[in-house]
Amino acid sequence: MQVNFDETCDSVIRMNANEQTRSANGIGNGNGESIPGIPDDLRCKRSDGKQWRCTAMSMADKTVCEKHYIQAKKRAANSAFRANQKKAKRRSSLGETDTYSEGKMDDFELPVTSIDHYNNGLASASKSNGRLEKRHNKSLMRYSPETPMMRSFSPRVAVDLNDDLGRDVVMFEEGYRSYRTPPSVAVMDPTRNRSHQSTSPMEYSAASTDVSAESLGEICHQCQRKDRERIISCLKCNQRAFCHNCLSARYSEISLEEVEKVCPACRGLCDCKSCLRSDNTIKVRIREIPVLDKLQYLYRLLSAVLPVIKQIHLEQCMEVELEKRLREVEIDLVRARLKADEQMCCNVCRIPVVDYYRHCPNCSYDLCLRCCQDLREESSVTISGTNQNVQDRKGAPKLKLNFSYKFPEWEANGDGSIPCPPKEYGGCGSHSLNLARIFKMNWVAKLVKNAEEIVSGCKLSDLLNPDMCDSRFCKFAEREESGDNYVYSPSLETIKTDGVAKFEQQWAEGRLVTVKMVLDDSSCSRWDPETIWRDIDELSDEKLREHDPFLKAINCLDGLEVDVRLGEFTRAYKDGKNQETGLPLLWKLKDWPSPSASEEFIFYQRPEFIRSFPFLEYIHPRLGLLNVAAKLPHYSLQNDSGPKIYVSCGTYQEISAGDSLTGIHYNMRDMVYLLVHTSEETTFERVRKTKPVPEEPDQKMSENESLLSPEQKLRDGELHDLSLGEASMEKNEPELALTVNPENLTENGDNMESSCTSSCAGGAQWDVFRRQDVPKLSGYLQRTFQKPDNIQTDFVSRPLYEGLFLNEHHKRQLRDEFGVEPWTFEQHRGEAIFIPAGCPFQITNLQSNIQVALDFLCPESVGESARLAEEIRCLPNDHEAKLQILEIGKISLYAASSAIKEVQKLVLDPKFGAELGFEDSNLTKAVSHNLDEATKRPQQNSCT
């Protein structure tokens, strides 16, 4: 049983009422003393293990009385504080488990977790990278990526879980306790109950070990001092208090009377470290979004994920119908018993299973539904009475695995059942695989039904097409007869007035967006490699600290991996020259900082950094209302999901052997890259002197030439100059610079904001391709970088996933022969680049720079992400793209569940009725009617 916060509060309230009633009637005092007449099964089970046992009545739904329950929680909190006091700064998981959406912990959507996970006495907390050691069930194939797990449980306090009291305490904490926030920085949500917060095991004052000191109004929330003369407590949250000195110095515009009603923290104005690390400001900002806007966000999200969950439901229905026909009886599908940090993958394609799958009870071989469909098609098996083509998307060719090549002896049975593969293929050869499931039987069907009811009852107005002559749009391409040469490029200040409407419209059409002046020069100065290393080093264990450590780096001149000292790399980052040869040292750090260290550094040392990002509704990893990927519960494994820091050396001087570059990336996630630091602190004129790029014959590469990465080609001297040179600049007129028509500038004289040029030197050059150009681009790469015929692969190979790089000759050839031209522009310090999912891009580092990247998933990108998931499924199993695949099916299910409950909460809540009715009465009426219909209508079986 998992007890959540609300149920616990209700139990405490009921218990207090019962205790008062018993005291009034003379039954007992509730303090563990004599209470005669209580049945043994209702008594508190607290004892000394010998003779004594507490005689008080146990709490409702608990095995102990209120006194011993609170004592146990305080003991666990103090134990957790002592155990983690020295290591709190090293926790890589920051933030709170609670999000704005309360729909992420459905009782019917949780995976089945066996209590055997805890029944070994003490919860084993292995200190491998600060993560709880995963125990794998041999009967299930688990997904074990090479990258560190980003979502996982933190090590728990050692509690004897065979004891009823210990089990109650641990399961109580599992229901609400943060898995990301270290004890030293956690701040509870102000909307939570005060009595519950006062004994929270995750909250304590920095000035005292008393976890409830601040909630009692003894300590100033801002300065953490309790020796102030006047401290004003907040009546809204009953938790925080501010001293008069801090209020007059930081919040002088708020009167003391207003502070007493609503404190700065509840207003989202507090800038202390605790509030920044707990995203309190962002929570308040999201909470204050108008209800109608929230509903529109949720409808957009539901409309985007509905096709995906309907596809999942249709595939499940087909398999259920087949299973009923094979068994000729009503079926009750076996549900897999997965632990919270486990993931089941298909034995063939290695893709995580969403819900239904086929399982061998003898050898535990697992097969996803898509592989079942591919095997039946390869075996030419026709299943009568079912819709076999539900997986086909209109207008898109179906991608499937080549089973006949990889498993020539494995075929589907004539009745449509799937036999277990022979032993040489990893199976046991049994006659049939049984249908099994992970979630509850009707969960997906209910989601589809409710989502359709809501979406069909609402219609959002179409966005107006923006004026491309607006000064906020910059010309990044010279395509003929094309309306998307201009890119939306506002400044951060402009976004505050424009809102997200224009961004939404651009994103829906798959166009990139750039945002200028996200960070100022003073903020960027704190992002140099030495400062990053110093801050990360402060979070590491003293025993593991190293003054000048070795780092892994890629030498862009030859593509080889080298070990360099931090000091040596820092010198190369600043001046970039080899003192012996005089050539630039073009190094890119590899996996430094690590994903976990990057997340820890950004959320702990730079808590204000995320808050400075634009479009937080889209990109925030936990609180973004429009970030579909943020709807996953915290216990789900999702790889490669944290912020990443990329440190590279670059130079404006062109090198004949190569350049500092990043090959073509083709992501199923939306990405944002923020250039936080460059080695050039002064403005200078860009001069790049290069030899003319020699003309290359227009012909295919030799059939014996393999598909090499740019680094490998550099090693063999096969790749020509990879950056813009004088010859190419003269030929490609006009230059693709950031320019706008002066006539379109705003009349207020704000030319600095509206101009697309920048006085500082560009740190990186970007080439971003449109989604509609992907087929032509893929064809060109397949023709130019062709694999030899003697190399065969088990699955489909896509050149866009191979990290190739297009130099100026390739881009010119691509434009002349295929009519494909990317958006080409320079990124300046403090500028953010938003790349939609499915838009290939490549980067050339024009000088040493540091990029911070965040991934997210907008509703407008869900369809493209689902399409790319099908492509990635057909890649070889050891391909990097497959190891980092986004579980778009599972994400869509959880997002739909979360959105449905949020809509119900907003629409049916009486306090929002007036606001919704005043804004749009028809919208409110339609949604309420559809929700009532969905609630009253009896839920049918998922596939009948």
From Swiss-Prot:
Record note on quaternary structure: Homodimer. Interacts with RDR2. Binds to CMT3. Associates with the E2 ubiquitin-conjugating enzyme UBC10.
Residue positions of motif Nuclear localization signal 1: 73-80
Major subcellular site: nucleus
Protein name: E3 ubiquitin-protein ligase JMJ24
Family: Belongs to the JARID1 histone demethylase family.
Annotated phenotype, changing residue 244 to A: Impaired self-ubiquitination and E3 ubiquitin ligase activity
Motif (Nuclear localization signal 2): 323-330
Binding site for Zn(2+) 1: 220, 223, 243, 246
Disruption phenotype: Reduced RNA-dependent DNA methylation (RdDM) target transcripts levels. Increased DNA (e.g. CHG cytosine methylation) and histone (e.g. H3K9me2) methylation, including on FWA, QQS and SDC loci and on retrotransposon-derived solo long terminal repeat (solo LTR), AtSN1 and SDC loci leading to their reduced expression. Increased silencing of the DNA transposon AtMu1c leading to slightly decreased transcript levels. Lower 24-nt small RNAs (smRNAs) accumulation as a result of AtSN1 derepression.
Enzyme class: transferase
